[in-house]
Design a protein with these regions (language model features):
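Conserved RecA-like P-loop NTPase helicase motor core
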Residues: 68, 181, 185-277
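Post-DEXD/H (motif II) to motif III coupling segment of the RecA-like Helicase ATP-binding lobe
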Residues: 35-36, 43-103, 274
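Conserved helicase ATPase core of P-loop NTP-dependent helicases/translocases
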Residues: 1-11, 26, 157, 166-212
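Conserved helix/coil segment N-terminal to the catalytic DExD/H
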Residues: 3-36, 47-52, 207
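Structural recognition of the conserved hydrophobic beta-strand(s) that form the central parallel beta-sheet
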Residues: 14-17, 60-67, 201-203
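Conserved interdomain hinge at the start of the Helicase C-terminal
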Residues: 120-161, 168-172
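A conserved SF2-helicase RecA2
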Residues: 77-102, 109-118, 230, 238-308
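Short, conserved loop/helix-junction motifs that constitute active-site signature segments
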Residues: 27-34, 53-59, 215, 236-245
Length: 309
């Protein structure tokens, strides 16, 4: 079921595009014949458009699949109202030997660190991310790291939220004879497959979040600020420990300018995730020093008893 295609007669299994089911007016009886409906990536069904698909597909049995069922906006209750609550959750797989290099980056250049505020005085994050991704010195840091790990024999994926950022990096990598390819939305399946064969893949976070399965990847570089990297990081954990040549490596660029308080909080959230997964976290400071991350436990203050004579 997709757009004007309605091929369901005599079929035991039917694949349907949620977008089409949500917005197209198919005959009601089309969906009455199904006994089981499986919604992949069901966390998307909390969206205003996509939830309409569940109102049309009301099978006796409804199953939702998702690696991230909890939505930031709290709208998981929308699809849970149709599908039901979580009934099974796999345990987190403990991946041994994963290393995280958190690399602090700082610059006073206004083209990079300018604080963009709206009329309410709140930061305009898209503009600030644009500035960060357009700043060549920072991008060159990402490229130098990529070249370093490529020459070690690692298979690298670079993720950024800006397509033009990826284009700039791809051009430099190709000029330096590093086999590289894009992995972004809108590309044809053949071209995506071609990119999968490259030593360096440049993709968007949205593409890495879903549908990417490239087992050979072992190194990920987070080239633009991001809060939730759970699914993105999972892309370098596909190779089994007993056959891998390199341990999984996460390169996390941490923008430390005081104007980037929101990005600082995002960085802390990522580090919290790394700690929960028991990854080894190495902090690369601006002064060149390197130290292992150790969370300092707060000592509870002792109560004081006051006696009035």
């Amino acid at each position: 079921i997709q757009q004007d295609t309605l091929d369901v007669d005599g079929k035991d299994i039917v694949l349907a595009m949620v977008q089409s089911v949500s917005v197209k007016d198919y005959p009601k009886e089309v969906f009455e014949q199904f006994g089981l409906a499986v919604f992949d990536e069901c966390h998307h069904l909390g969206a205003e458009v996509f939830f309409k698909s569940m109102r049309k597909v009301a099978s006796k049995y409804m199953l939702g699949l998702s690696a991230t069922p909890k939505r930031k906006d709290g709208l998981q209750w929308v699809f849970e109202s149709f599908i039901g609550p979580i009934v099974y959750m796999t345990k987190d797989v403990v991946t041994e030997g994963v290393e995280v290099n958190v690399i602090d980056y700082y610059s006073e250049d206004e083209n990079y660190c300018k604080e963009c505020l709206n009329y309410m005085g709140k930061p305009v994050l898209p503009k600030m991310i644009n500035n960060i991704c357009a700043f060549w010195e920072r991008t060159k840091l990402v490229l130098d790291l990529t070249k370093k790990y490529f020459e070690m024999g690692r298979k690298v994926i670079i993720l950024s939220d800006r397509r033009n950022h990826l284009d700039v990096m791809l051009e430099w990598l190709l000029q330096n004879d590093i086999p590289s390819g894009l992995y972004v939305g809108g590309m044809k399946p053949f071209d995506l497959h071609e990119s999968q064969e490259k030593d360096v893949i440049l993709g968007t976070f949205s593409m890495a979040a879903e549908g990417m399965d490239i087992p050979k990847l072992n190194t990920i570089i987070l080239a633009s600020p991001k809060s939730d990297v759970v699914q993105a990081v999972g892309r370098i954990m596909r190779e089994k420990a007993n056959v891998r040549k390199f341990h999984p490596l996460i390169i996390d660029i941490n923008d430390t300018h005081p104007n980037f308080q929101t990005f600082k909080r995002q960085s802390q959230k990522r580090i919290t995730f790394y700690k929960k997964q028991k990854y080894k976290i190495m902090l690369h400071k601006e002064d060149g020093s390197i130290e292992e991350y150790k969370k300092v436990k707060k000592i509870a203050k002792k109560g004081v008893c006051l006696i009035d004579d």
